[in-house]
């Protein structure tokens, strides 16, 4: 028996190894990373606080949880949408402020979050339909006669911006920490969290796998394009210490807007933390007053 394997045996071994490593880099790792993009945050339902009524809306065959507090039909109804990994419970404090102003308020659990159905999140892709389902529910109940105000945070900000397009009933939109578009957001977070540069092929392959698994088009999820496609007044809030959706990204979304818009930067605020700033409600409510809401 020779001390070394023949050349053709070594060549075959190296080809097998190359095929294995290629599979890992181009298939297995992107498949695992796609789950990071698609992972929601389901949790058991809780009872609504006093004054709120638990309900649901149907979006693309998925049953989504809502909490609604009824107000005056003379005020625009408000839809409040959470961000990635969150649920409607976190936004009751915001809803209470609007309720005290007389607004009907609807809190929504997006798909694959909270107590809503769904296996995947699409970071504002299919979630547009979730927001529009909530809007339609308010219209169906006769609660949107004075129009609608949409408020979204992070992923929810992208969802409400996209949901506002082609909706004349939308009177004003408030967004905090939106990203500009799906691909740019994934590239940014790949570097921020994993130090993966843009040229690494894992990232576009991961996006393609996520598109295939969840049935959406990443290029459709574009908050800048959505902002340019409706004219209702827009308040864009940037969190001053936010590394995920920095001020420059928020301004890019706002500067593209087709109608009146303003940007407020909450100094020192972390991601979706502007509400902790003492000027938060002064800014938000002054904007709504100026918008006739």
Question: How should these model regions be labeled?
Answer:
Residues 163-216, 273:
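Hydrolase active-site cap/lid region
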Residues 229-231, 236-238:
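Short beta-strand/loop motif that positions the catalytic acidic residue
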Residues 2-58, 64-67:
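An N-terminal hydrophobic leader/cap segment in hydrolases
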Residues 243-249:
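Conserved alpha/beta-hydrolase "acid-adjacent" motif
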Residues 269-281:
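Catalytic histidine-centered segment of alpha/beta-hydrolase-like enzymes
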Residues 121-142:
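Alpha/beta-hydrolase active-site loop
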Residues 142-154:
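Alpha/beta-hydrolase fold nucleophile elbow
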Residues 95-117:
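Conserved alpha/beta-hydrolase
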